[in-house]
Amino acid sequence: MRKQVIGINNIFHLARIRSIPVHCHCKGPLYSYPVVSKTLFHTKNVEVSKYSHVELRSLNEQIHSQLTSLTDLNKRQLLLVETLSRNNNLEKLLDYYEIDEGSVEDAIQLLQDSNVSIQEFSSMIQPVLNRTNLVGKYHMGYLSKLMQIYISLTRTHNGGSVDALNKDDMNKFIKRFIEGSQLKRAQTALQFLLDGYKERGEDLLGPYGDKQTIAHFLMLRSGALQDLWKIDVSNGNNKKQAFYKINGSHRNVKSTYNVLDSVKLFEIVRYILRYNDKDNHSQPVYFDEGILKNVILCLGYVGQTTLIEDIINKIWELDSVSVPPKYNITVTSDLLTAIVSAYSKCGKSIQPGLVIADKFFGKIPNIIVKDDFWINLQKWNIILPNKWRSTIDLSKRTWELMKSWRNSTNNGGFITANVEFLNLVYKVLSSDYIKLKDLEWIYDIFQHSLVTLYSKNSLTVDEIKLLKKFQIFTIKKMVYFGHYSKCLQFIKEWSYDAANKQQLTNLFVVLRNRYLQKRGYNQEKEMTKVQKKYDEEEQEDMLLGGLW
């Protein structure tokens, strides 16, 4: 009988023609995909008898026999194809991508070669796009491959123009790429959308422009990505400029993030400032919290705080407390964070941002403010080149504003002890510029925030570290200022168990004895200096008396 050499792809082709399910060592049959134009898997060829006149049952047995003799790599490749065949599970293939990148790419290439519709492919990629932990190298590579297929399918079926489905999907790709710090890939996705608008004869800022694309344009082209800002922290005393990132490691950094297009930014600003609600019945797309947040960040990045002030006055009229805002725009924590960041970058101080945030709290009740807002304030305060005493005072003002907001929202009482925020406060407090009056602030932090940790059934490692840091710091400062009785009262009140109380008491005794000994030594040394000076003066008087 004549022999014929076939590969894996031929097996799929044969199975499809004969309507025979192909099996491997995994559960269930392999879905029979259409023949692709290229060899799907590069495997060693295997020999089977010519089967043009063989019964279907016998043929199925022969194919199964050949599959059982394949290498482990071949079996894994077939497993990937079967995984894809089950409900078109692209999300499951994501887990294999790091193990066998090439095989996974070959597997998903089947979809494009099988002429799947853009609607079907969109449905298949949603579980992948909706995952929130896609930040690794292989995750980004997998997303990039899916995006390339998506773009190719869109050009094939839609001629390159984009509809509402394409806009939504591509903006999800952009969001994930930004989260994974893949700006080049995000720019590719954005450019595809912009080309799609052009293909339809539409303008991004026209009536068919969508909020997501405008927001991502401002992030990628106009400076709204705050995490990538280079912050100049040099002052008049520094000859060399130093740059930090707000969420970086507070070291000199280099960044290629620059403004690529400010034209559309200022078009939006002009439209906002010239808009007259009397002439229009509907609120324009730019009067959206997400877009306004990014516009304000962009203006802060390019140093246009005057325009930020104009926009705030136009929309919210903060100086007129009794006048309600004209427009139905929710003031969110992210919007307030953008305002503070924009002013901080331009003015090298959080002071203007604190003033504006206070005005918002006074005019608009029950603003929901997330911990990220307060954390962002403290980060700016630490980074900016203020005198350290000024940094302490501004940090204290942030704390007072936090308490004031808490009371204004009818949620008065305790402030949840956020570990990241309080660690930043501790960094400010642990400087050498703490004064006696600052002890009241430290005690206030215990009373209104750290107290929430004492009511928890169990504490995390980070919470225990935070609590002990504040306990030890407070005891050190109390001993330093000579408040021994208050220190003992503090230990009694704020130790969380017997062992902690004993540790703090032992620390107090050691520190007190050390400071007493040091002060005693200094007093003795000072008395020696005084006595020596007195003796020298006596000798001088005796000499002068003898001469006269």
Curated annotation (Swiss-Prot):
Superkingdom of this protein's organism: Eukaryota
Organelle targeting sequence: 1-27
Transmembrane segments: none
Gene Ontology CC terms, in alphabetical order: mitochondrion
Molecular function via GO: RNA binding
Gene Ontology annotations of biological process type: regulation of translation
Job of this protein: Required for translation of the mitochondrial OLI1 transcript coding for the mitochondrial ATP synthase subunit 9.
Record family assignment: Belongs to the AEP2 family.
Assembly and binders: Binds to the 5'UTR of the OLI1 mRNA.
Name of protein: ATPase expression protein 2, mitochondrial
